[in-house]
Amino acid sequence: MKRFGYGAGSSTSKIAVAARFCFRGFLLFCADIIGEVTEITVKGGGMSEISCENIFQDHYDFWGHLSDKQKTYLISHTHEVHYKRGETLHYGGDDCIGVILIASGMFRIYLLSDEGRDVTLFRLYDHDVCMLSASCALDAVTFDVHIDAESETVGYLIEAAAFRQLMNENIYVKSFADEIIVENFSDVMWTMQQILFMGIDKRLALFLYDEMSRTGQVEIKMTHDQIARYIGSAREVVSRMLKYFVSEKMVELSRGGIRIVDKEKLRRLAG
């Protein structure tokens, strides 16, 4: 996900404030449509000043706008964290651990209905920033989403209280947070557009083509159940559609995976 820096008082930042307040209501609407706190491993308190500075300079646009005191404060409240595959790090509005920069791995952000059905809103990858794990740091906003680690993940966690304090003190930190929330809102809108207005054949083709493009591999190592969660469908529906793709010679199925054999045909179906 591309990051852009915003200066104090920018029009985009004002739009972001409005987006943050409508985001929660939109997610509640989505939840209507789709009808154990996990421990994290924290290595030793704060990270070293040198490693933190390198990380912040590379991935946080606001770093150059912090005072020396704010930089020291941020470093002392940043930790390296590790999550196992399948581990849940955020349970709706029940917790607020902080802002996480993903060094390596993947997070899945999803809605969970009262009946236990879930739908994936978006995923985050290497070098993305997870802001929704610090939803309590965002004024008057509660994001009722869950976040899982979809693979072994290493990240750098800024404690929620520390990030909130910096947002209150520094407009550039607040603008950075607003930018990410707007990006998340855009991702959610795209997901719901697919679920509401795209046929399952096109949604599945688009997902497979995007995964192939992202990984650079024609072998997609996912179960039918995983794919169903990602595209907001049922496993049985995905399985039937994959069999149709096989009959059209677009893919081949194997145990625990899918091989794309006709990229162009899949691309045309994905649109």
Model-derived segments and spans:
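Short, Lys/Arg-enriched N-terminal segments with co-localized hydrophobic residues
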Residues: G25-G46
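Cyclic nucleotide-binding regulatory module and flanking cytosolic helices
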Residues: E39, K43-K84, A134-L138
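A cytosolic small-molecule/anion-sensing beta-strand core signal
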Residues: K84-R85, A103-S104, Y125, S151
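Short phosphate-coordinating micro-motif centered on Lys-Gly-acidic
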Residues: L89-D94
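Glycine- and acidic-residue-biased ligand/ion/polar-headgroup-sensing regions
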Residues: I97, L101-Y110, H127
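Cyclic-nucleotide recognition modules
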Residues: T120-D178
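Polybasic "coupling" helices that flank or enter modular domains
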Residues: E150-E152, N168-S233
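Phosphate-/nucleic-acid-contacting segments
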Residues: Y209-G271
